[in-house]
Amino acid sequence: MARPRRAREPLLVALLPLAWLAQAGLARAAGSVRLAGGLTLGGLFPVHARGAAGRACGQLKKEQGVHRLEAMLYALDRVNADPELLPGVRLGARLLDTCSRDTYALEQALSFVQALIRGRGDGDEVGVRCPGGVPPLRPAPPERVVAVVGASASSVSIMVANVLRLFAIPQISYASTAPELSDSTRYDFFSRVVPPDSYQAQAMVDIVRALGWNYVSTLASEGNYGESGVEAFVQISREAGGVCIAQSIKIPREPKPGEFSKVIRRLMETPNARGIIIFANEDDIRRVLEAARQANLTGHFLWVGSDSWGAKTSPILSLEDVAVGAITILPKRASIDGFDQYFMTRSLENNRRNIWFAEFWEENFNCKLTSSGTQSDDSTRKCTGEERIGRDSTYEQEGKVQFVIDAVYAIAHALHSMHQALCPGHTGLCPAMEPTDGRMLLQYIRAVRFNGSAGTPVMFNENGDAPGRYDIFQYQATNGSASSGGYQAVGQWAETLRLDVEALQWSGDPHEVPSSLCSLPCGPGERKKMVKGVPCCWHCEACDGYRFQVDEFTCEACPGDMRPTPNHTGCRPTPVVRLSWSSPWAAPPLLLAVLGIVATTTVVATFVRYNNTPIVRASGRELSYVLLTGIFLIYAITFLMVAEPGAAVCAARRLFLGLGTTLSYSALLTKTNRIYRIFEQGKRSVTPPPFISPTSQLVITFSLTSLQVVGMIAWLGARPPHSVIDYEEQRTVDPEQARGVLKCDMSDLSLIGCLGYSLLLMVTCTVYAIKARGVPETFNEAKPIGFTMYTTCIIWLAFVPIFFGTAQSAEKIYIQTTTLTVSLSLSASVSLGMLYVPKTYVILFHPEQNVQKRKRSLKATSTVAAPPKGEDAEAHK
């Protein structure tokens, strides 16, 4: 908010002596261009560079200084020559040199407020008197400045704006872009025809994102322009997301020797951040490029320069190879043909109003006008005055000329609108505009809208900012030569980015956009593990084992019946396997089973054929057929174990797995028990023991077997059989080897449970075989049964560790099934081989031995009771 008039009075009085001092100094220096007019505009231009120590001003700046100053003179000439714009009113000017220094510019700007200060105070108010009390002589009153065009650098504009606002003098800058100047509470009289760096920063963020970069460093010259620009870039990138700042480096205002080499070393601390965002002045840009070349990093950094770089050749002169690929941004502008015609016709004769033009002439044509000229080298030729710009020297219109012209026209249009409102129908100034109210003029300035010198609309928002419109350039080599290259337009930005990515060229592969990423993209089947505090950086973690990639941040385990795809980007069904007929694991047990069935069938057929022969009768025909049936079932169970699991097959497995062994061992147990009881009874009495008849033996055998049958039937009823697919059995470390196993719903323990009862019978039978090992030779089956049981026990003792020891194997289904069926077939083969193969051999090949023997052993006669009559007596033979 502006200060009230009373509050400003003491400040105005305090500034009065400074204004006098400034006037005196300016008069001595003759440091301004003056044009007479009814309304005077001020102008601030960096005609000279910053001076060395002890000097305010340095070398002449031909383009940024003289071109821009002449652009204002050109614009004033056009406005004053336009009968439709401010008719009867001539605009004058007072143009000052800021020498590219904010403090010096502030001293210069005090001349703009002299008229206002003089209007507020006089010699009586400040007590200034000459000897004798005579008032001092005062110079002619200065012209009243109604508005100021300038300054160039943001730091200069900020310094000047703080003074001009005190006196309500509107200010329009043609080049100051610092976001700080958008603060209308502090710089309420400041406007600009160039967009603020906040727009430029947004455009640069959009460029970075369009190139696919997410990890960049920033480089700023110390001061309002550089620091504010980087701050805006960082803030916008943080709000937009997806772009992280690796390094944020500030170049000191007065850099020490080796400072720029240090900057390059710091940038290389994060080598993946190849994109470098630069908000720096021309000199700093040049020295950064030089340091990059000295470090042999040509082509490593990907420069994105602000409008201070723009499309200028001076920052990259002789450094083109380092600048190849640099993307720069510049407020949308056009070359003004009328200014080119105007400036190229300027000469020493027709441009005496510009007090710096003679110095420009010497600098531009490398000559000297007088012995006191600025060109002090004795070898420099003398200027003839006939030199011509563009003919005898190179000429290219400076980039901000358009904006200087637009700034002048903005003030002219505002004054014209104000004149129409306050002086309707009046030619020339009316009393209502003498003096011109700065606050009212500011309102008219903010309301202007017209097509500028380049044909683009000129307007201001509530903060005095122009809309953001930028051209985007890239420095590209020509035919492989960087030195002969140039800036090529590759896009535009006006609230949204339009970038022709295909038109971009880069060192290395010209058409492949280089990367500036903290971390490379993760491959298929990998998730991002973010680095804490740096959202653009991550580590890639493989979704290993049975996990698959859900999204870029998450891995999850596949469902139990599935396994991941080879690249772990999804899940697929796990293949289902079973022990098939063609499996190598099924061949040995099937071969044994077939041979066993053939052998068993042969024995049974032989026994049936020779049913009434002594050997068959002596074997106990009834129990032999029961035992052979059990052996046959044992062999047959192999086919059930290999068959595809289903409800019927699973039920048959449960029922017959233990039935064959139970039937066999029940018969063997009954036989050994009968022999043992006969032998023991004979020791005590001649009376035979009970239940030794064939019928009794069958009853005992079937009674023992019925327990197994009843148990199995009860199990079938309690838990109906069905097949399942077990995905855990072959869930290997390598998912590619994982398989689902189709099998019956029987655990390892339940499988052994089916055989548990028969194993108990086997152990009991073995115990009786041991007890009966001392029976007389007349009981010719005692010893074969004993050998059978011993061997069977050994087989099953070997079976148990193999069966349970492979429980964790990937080949479990094959090993356990094969082990079980082979063990069953071997135990059946032992029984068949020990008990019946010898008898069959005698029956078939030695029939002469298949006769009833009459002799008895004397020992047997004297120690054993008489055996029962009939075929049981044959067992004694």
UniProtKB/Swiss-Prot annotation:
Residues 1-24 form the signal peptide. This is Metabotropic glutamate receptor 6. GO terms for cellular component: dendrite; endoplasmic reticulum membrane; Golgi membrane; new growing cell tip; plasma membrane; synapse. It is found in: Cell membrane; Endoplasmic reticulum membrane; Golgi apparatus membrane; Cell projection, Dendrite. Detected in melanocytes. Changing G58R: In CSNB1B; abolishes expression at the cell membrane. Disulfide bonds join C57-C99, C244-C536, C367-C383, C423-C430, C518-C537, C522-C540, C543-C555, C558-C571. The lineage of its organism: Eukaryota, Metazoa, Chordata, Craniata, Vertebrata.
